[in-house]
Amino acid sequence: MDITYDDLPVEIWIRILKFMKDSAVNLVLVNTDFFKLIYFKKNKFYELKEFNFGMQKNYVKQRITLINYVVEKGYLDIIVYINNLKSNHNPLIIDNIKILGSISKDTALWYSCKNNNLATTKYFINKGASINSSSLPLKTACIEGHLDTVKYLFSCGIEIINSIYDCIVSACCYGRLNIVIYLSNKISIPGDYINEAFVMACKYGYLDIAKYLFNLDCSITVDALYGACINGHIEVVEYLIGLGVDPRKEKCWAITSACQGGHLNIIEFLLSLGIKPKEINVDAFYHACKTGNLEIAKYLKEIGADTITRRDWALELSARGGYLDVVKYIIELGVSQKSLNKALIDATLFCRVEVVEYLVDSGSDFRQNDDYLFRSIICTRDYVEMAEYFIMKGVNIIVNNNEPIKTVCHNGCIGILKLLIMYGVDYNPIKDQLINIAKSNNQSAIIKYLEDLDTLK
């Protein structure tokens, strides 16, 4: 039995909408009769958006307006229906504008091109959306690989300007060979754009596109090799070497790029071409370490590459990145006291607790420059765990006339404020000063906590 809007009392419809949660928007869009259910929505609809983090899928509840939703989905009949109601000043639209929302024609065109909704693309262009005020609709269609949409935009008389040429570069970044072929046949693309497109194709590993562009007589630069090396595209690397690209340029920067990307197979391949370890750029070791590639750092040492010249930098940036295994390895190789101290600053700045503890155990001076790390870094960032570690190690928590507690009040670091008081900082003589510092920096949580301290006692 079919159910219409008038078959059920309002209270039941409200319960149904609540029960359907993220699917409620689809109920409203079943037909024009059910569309009246938006009267019962107090807040915007929402849908669950899927986001992938590595191998794990996550869903985030995201508020949506009805018009954005139907445009994104390409529901042309509903779009036309809503626009007709709007043109007639229908109360259903006027009274529910918060739920319905609004969208410009140009934005709607962009959504349509992004999702390859050709029918809505045609509709919004006919309604006056501009295909020439921005290259975004065309560029988006190129990135997504929607050839039919790209063809239609050109059929509408799109202006050929520099931003249009850039679309072939964007298509190369996403491996859209069909788009690259169409654009190169449709318009005359300047050589600079073809050259950049070739570099992007190599960088992102699209060998088929690289080969196609090479046949268009593009210029081959070493930048294409660097991009392929850093991203681990061994087939592209082999292809470029076959074309005559010299891997020895800039002190074998191709190997340095592979070190940064963590691609041992590419390093070994390049060395097999006759490159000597001593020819490798001194930055190779540093780049391997700063990106946490311990295996490559060890490999460079084993083959006799320079691991000394940039060792201090390597330690500092591996500490900054929190790569404890790399930090341990570099310290085993031998570093100066100055290097240990600078690495501790970086690790503290980026709250790498395990690295900080290891560096301190290895001899880094955690009290350097009158407890600078504690008073000027930790106390400005509310690193509570690290603050307690430093306090337990013996930093002066009232250094420079109570600078730490003043700093946390200035920066709103309430966790460390509580910690300092717990470990015995006498706040009473300077309580008014601390409150004034917090007030001048709009730190309401600090103000409330300080004012409530006597009550808590």
Curated annotation (Swiss-Prot):
Domain of life: Viruses
Keywords: ANK repeat, Repeat
InterPro entries: Ankyrin_rpt (IPR002110), Ankyrin_rpt-contain_sf (IPR036770)
Annotated ANK repeat ranges: 62-91, 104-132, 133-162, 193-219, 220-249, 251-279, 281-309, 310-339, 341-368, 400-429, 431-457
Name of protein: Putative ankyrin repeat protein L112
Species of provenance: Acanthamoeba polyphaga mimivirus
